[in-house]
UniProtKB/Swiss-Prot annotation:
Family, similarity comment: Belongs to the Integrator subunit 8 family.
Main location per the UniProt record: nucleus
Entry keyword annotation includes Glycosyltransferase: no
Gene this protein is translated from: Ints8
One biological process term in Gene Ontology: protein localization to chromatin
Protein name: Integrator complex subunit 8
UniProt remark on domains: The WFEF motif is required for the recruitment of protein phosphatase 2A (PP2A) to transcription pause-release checkpoint.
Organism expressing this protein natively: Mus musculus
Phosphothreonine modified-residue sites: 18
UniProt entry keywords in alphabetical sequence: Chromosome, Nucleus, Phosphoprotein, Repeat, TPR repeat
Keyword Lipoprotein attached: no
Complex formation: Component of the Integrator complex, composed of core subunits INTS1, INTS2, INTS3, INTS4, INTS5, INTS6, INTS7, INTS8, INTS9/RC74, INTS10, INTS11/CPSF3L, INTS12, INTS13, INTS14 and INTS15. The core complex associates with protein phosphatase 2A subunits PPP2CA and PPP2R1A, to form the Integrator-PP2A (INTAC) complex.
Purpose: Component of the integrator complex, a multiprotein complex that terminates RNA polymerase II (Pol II) transcription in the promoter-proximal region of genes.
Length: 995
């Protein structure tokens, strides 16, 4: 032997080998093998697998000489296999928790029926008619096991179960799963019919006063040897595993409680029975202790049941001290004692008894009641939110958005309550350093977030704040407050009361500044500034608020005014006017701008023109937000002023781009296309990008009715937008000498940035203009080479079909722009079917099939009076129907696919038949058969259900096909009417599903 061979042999011999798995038939050949196998630490196969194998082999049907399937024969082999299955269950001590977890309902049903059979329970006799006290202990125990399993299975079937993710389709496996599913449903149907009897049997068991016995492996062997002496009080019936009365009653009480609790959802009075059984279970568990072998009760689940029963059926003899906080909260909510809920939550902040999720659910419930009109709950919602926030702070979680929203406008009462909750939620002497640190950080952050110094002093002077924060931390906080507001002089020592501070000049200045910030009356603003300038000449009062913002093109002119009072007044009037315009407070904005115009007319022609421009913009916005919404045309003088602004050529006048932008949008919205295309001066077209864009849009709208060859401006508009959406490529040499390509997202290749174009478009409301822009961007989106699903749009044929330099276009930005444009256009008119189809196509292209169906259906609904009329064929084209079919198919709604195949100009039978063959359908299936009008599809359905043995569904298909209006000999008008009626009902059903 060579050295290599010796090494291989040594390696092979040293490798541990896995012992072969014991086969089921080996247990038939050797009687003692089962006990040896079960005594192993990790037997393979496991005990529950053995039960499945034994019963599977014992229940296999046989085939006779005529090749006919016969039921499994009652021979010695099958009897031994069933006995082996029972012995394995006896080894597991008949623990239903283990058996239910590992065995399917049909297998466990077979096992327990075999137990009843071997325990000599007379077949066909109702268990409820049998006297358990007169039966042998093992027989009574077998009946109890079966009835316990029955109600446990009913309860378990009521819980939602997550469907297992199907693997690759395999016909045999799928058929087997389908058979097992149907068998389980049949067993559950029988068990539910027997549920009342099962409960009576278990209630009778609670009246038993004797110990019971359950079969062991030894007693089962004795039964096999002495079948004639089983039913008497012999050794066999009392030699099993002893189950004490208390253990049996404890387990039965728990199972009955679960059954009653499940039934309580339909009859709330039954919750009282559930409560009684669960609390009796707790008492028996306390008596039995941890020595029980038979009781396998999940004590956490039992505690949850008891808590739920306390809430649903509060005990009359329990006082509030005996109830859990959870129950107390529910009782208070039911009685409307919301202040008591607040106190419970504050006390719970010390004990952390209530789950955070429960506290949040209480707050959500109260918020909903407050939103429904119960204004008295607003204060309670705030208090509960504060309690929850303090709990979150103590446990180191982030502060909720709700607290920040409710604390936007603090007042003295809110601050007082917050400090009370904080003080009562922490025991400073016993609390850990982490709890103290969390609370201190929270109080500091609250201080930093407050603008009113009165409230800051309330917190900083509080005992808890002084206790938790060290001197250094308080000094640091003071420094931070000083940086935030240089005019604030905080003292480190706590102030007893804010109102005790004596008034001084600085306080008077602060009060006037506060009034200056709040006032929108131009004459009051002027008076305040005169007073302030009389008190001090060193200050620049236009800097009082950082919210006062004036565009830089204006501020350089305004700040050049030499007189301090005039400069402050002009700046503040303009800043406040611009702010009011932004928040759509147009009347106050008009007052402020008018006062500013009167002021600057006296000394600055430049600022006078600025104010005239701003007042023009204000008038445009006022009209568009007011009567313009209802379609009323603007007055002719406003249109003349807009033209005058566009044609203005005054040098050195500071201009805001937004004014020109709004003016062009205004002209497009009111269809002033003649002016934009023929009367705009040439210099404007060259110098103002918005005028150029507006002229191209207006000209394209005018040329739409003409032939394609005459649409020169459409090509010009296309080139302008392509340039805007193009990226500039720059080459950069790195440290390693390599040249890399950099794409500049916002390039200056076009007449404006893409973001500016988007901002301009969002000022348009004219449907035709928006349709043209949307059509252009959709075409640009479809031009890309890697596009899989095109998006459709109106007038898409007017645009060029290719781009010379395809790589230069930023298609990612184009896709984002298309989505934003569709979102905006639908906010203008949510009933435009063409825009809805575009939105649906976008969702389809991004594989959001449910959303795509929503918009396809909405597009059909808006142009057919919710499908009461026929959907126009130019809306539901074959392409749209095919995309709806694909969406339904990918959502596993295969019956919907088959019905939609009828909507095509030529019915797609291949797709319809293939979809109907799918068994894993997530739609209403046979409930949709009434919507099928094509007889060929109905005939195929009848054949398919007959082939599968689905009698009920076959009858539904036959009933649908038998309707007289579908008779092929009917006139064409009758058949069309029948099809239209079914289309209407189907589309309305789909709309209810996806809307």
């Amino acid at each position: 032997m060579s050295a290599e061979a010796a090494d291989r042999e040594a390696a092979t011999s040293s490798r541990p080998c896995t012992p072969p798995q014991t086969c089921w038939f080996e247990f038939l050949l050797e009687e003692s093998l089962l006990e040896k196998h079960l005594r192993k630490a990790c037997p393979d196969p496991a005990p529950v697998q053995l039960i499945v194998q034994f019963l599977e082999q014992a229940s296999k049907p046989s085939v006779n000489e005529q090749n006919q399937v016969q039921p499994p024969p009652d021979n010695k082999r099958n009897r031994v296999l069933k006995l082996l299955a029972l012995k394995v269950a006896a080894h597991l001590k008949w623990d239903l928790d283990i058996l239910e977890k590992s065995l399917s309902v049909p297998v466990l049903n077979m096992l327990l029926n075999e137990l009843l059979c071997i325990s000599k329970v007379p077949p066909g006799t109702k268990h409820v008619d049998m006297d358990l006290s007169a039966l042998p202990p093992t027989t009574a125990m077998a009946i109890l096991l079966y009835n316990r399993w029955a109600i446990r299975t009913i309860v378990q079937s009521s819980f939602p179960v997550k469907q297992a993710k199907p693997g690759p389709p395999q016909l045999n496996v799928m058929n087997q799963m389908q058979q097992e599913k149907e068998l389980t449903e049949n067993i559950l149907k029988v068990l539910k019919e027997q549920a009342a009897d099962c409960i009576l049997v278990l209630e009778a068991a609670l009246r038993l006063n004797k110990d019971l016995y359950v079969h062991t492996m030894r007693t089962l062997d004795l039964l096999a040897v002495e079948p004639g002496t089983v039913n008497g009080e012999t050794e066999n019936s009392t030699a099993g595993l002893k189950i004490r009365t208390e253990e049996m009653q404890c387990q039965v009480c728990y199972d009955l409680g679960a059954a009653y609790f499940q039934q309580g959802s339909t009859d709330s009075a039954i919750y009282e029975n559930a409560r009684e059984k669960f609390f009796r279970t707790k008492e028996l568990l306390a008596e039995i202790g941890s020595l029980s072998l038979h009781c396998t009760i999940d004590e956490k689940r039992l505690a949850g049941y008891c808590q739920a029963c306390d809430v649903l059926v509060p005990s009359s003899d329990n006082n509030s001290q005996q109830l859990t906080p959870y129950s107390q909260v529910h009782i208070c909510l039911r009685s409307g004692s919301y202040q008591e809920v607040v106190q419970i939550f504050i006390e719970d902040n010390l004990t952390f008894t209530l789950p955070v999720q429960f506290r949040q659910s209480v707050l959500r419930e109260l918020f909903q009641k407050a939103q429904q009109g119960n204004e008295a709950l607003d204060e309670i919602c705030f208090k509960i939110c504060v309690c929850n926030t303090v709990r979150d702070v103590l446990e180191g979680r982030t502060i909720s958005v709700q607290f920040n929203q409710l604390f936007l406008r603090p007042n003295k009462e809110k601050i007082d309550f917050l400090l009370e909750v904080c003080s009562r939620s922490i025991n400073v002497e016993k609390a850990s350093d982490s709890l103290k640190g969390n609370m201190a950080a929270f109080l500091k952050n609250v201080c930093l977030g407050l603008e009113d110094l009165q409230y800051v002093f309330m917190i900083s002077s509080h005992e808890l704040f002084i206790t938790l924060l060290k001197d250094e931390e308080r000094k640091l906080l003071v420094d931070q407050m000083r940086k935030r507001s240089p005019r604030v002089n905080l003292c480190i020592k706590p102030v007893t009361s804010f109102y005790d501070i004596p008034a001084s000049a600085s306080v008077n200045i602060g009060q006037l500044e506060h009034q200056l910030i709040l006032s929108v009356d131009p004459w009051r603003i002027r008076q305040i500034l005169i007073e302030l300038h009389g008190m001090t000449s060193e200050r620049q009062f236009w800097t009082v608020s950082n919210k006062w913002e004036v565009p830089s093109v204006y501020s350089s002119v305004i700040l050049g005014i030499k007189d301090n009072l005039t400069r402050d007044l002009v700046y503040i009037l303009m800043a406040k006017g611009l702010h009011c315009s932004t928040v759509k407070d147009f009347p106050h904005s008009k007052q402020l701008f008018t006062a500013c115009l009167e002021l600057v007319t006296e000394f600055s022609p430049k600022l006078r023109q600025v104010m005239l421009n701003e007042m023009l913009l204000l008038d445009i916005r006022t009209h568009e937000a007011g009567v313009g919404q209802s379609g009323e045309r603007p007055p002719s003088d406003l249109i003349s002023r807009v033209r005058g602004y566009l044609e203005m050529r005054l040098p050195d006048i500071p201009l805001r781009q937004v004014v020109a932008e709004e003016c062009v949008a205004f002209m497009l919205n009111w269809r002033e296309n003649e002016y934009l295309t023929l009367q705009v001066p040439a210099f404007l077209f060259q110098n103002n990008p918005y005028v150029k864009l507006g002229q191209l849009l207006a000209a394209t709208c005018k040329e739409l009715p003409g032939p394609k060859e005459s649409r020169r401006t459409a090509k010009d508009l296309w080139e302008v937008v392509v340039q805007i959406c193009s990226v500039s490529n720059q080459h950069k040499r790195g440290n390693d000498g390599r040249v890399s390509l950099i794409k500049q997202r916002e390039s200056t290749l076009g007449i404006m940035y893409r973001s500016e174009l988007l901002s301009f478009i969002k000022k348009l409301r004219e449907p035709l203009v928006l349709t043209i822009i949307l059509s252009l961007f959709v075409k640009l989106h479809n031009v890309r080479e890697d596009i899989v699903n095109d998006i459709t749009a109106e007038h898409i044929s007017i645009w060029p079909s290719s781009i010379p330099n395809l790589q230069s276009v930023d298609f990612e930005a184009v896709a984002i722009t298309v989505k934003e444009l569709v979102r905006y256009t639908l906010s203008i008119n949510p009933n435009n079917h063409a825009w809805l189809i575009i939105q649906a196509d976008i969702y389809f292209a991004t594989n959001q099939h449910s959303a795509a169906l929503h918009y396809y259906l909405q597009a059909g609904a808006v142009c057919s009076d919710f499908f009461n009329k026929a959907v126009p064929p130019d809306v539901y084209t074959d392409q749209v129907i095919k995309r709806m079919i694909k969406c339904c198919s990918l959502l596993n709604c295969h019956t919907q696919v088959a019905i939609l195949c009828q909507f095509l100009r030529e019915i797609d039978y291949k797709t319809a038949f293939k979809s109907l063959q799918e068994q894993n359908s997530h739609d209403a299936m046979d409930s949709y058969y009434d919507y099928i009008w094509d007889v060929t599809i109905l005939e195929y359905l009848t054949y398919l259900h007959h082939k599968r043995g689905e009698t009920d569904k076959r009858q539904i298909a036959i009933k649908a096909i038998g309707q007289t209006e579908l008779n092929a000999s009917n006139p064409e008008e009758v058949l069309q009417l029948a099809a239209q009626r079914r289309k209407k009902k189907f589309l309305q059903a789909m709309a209810k599903l996806y809307f």
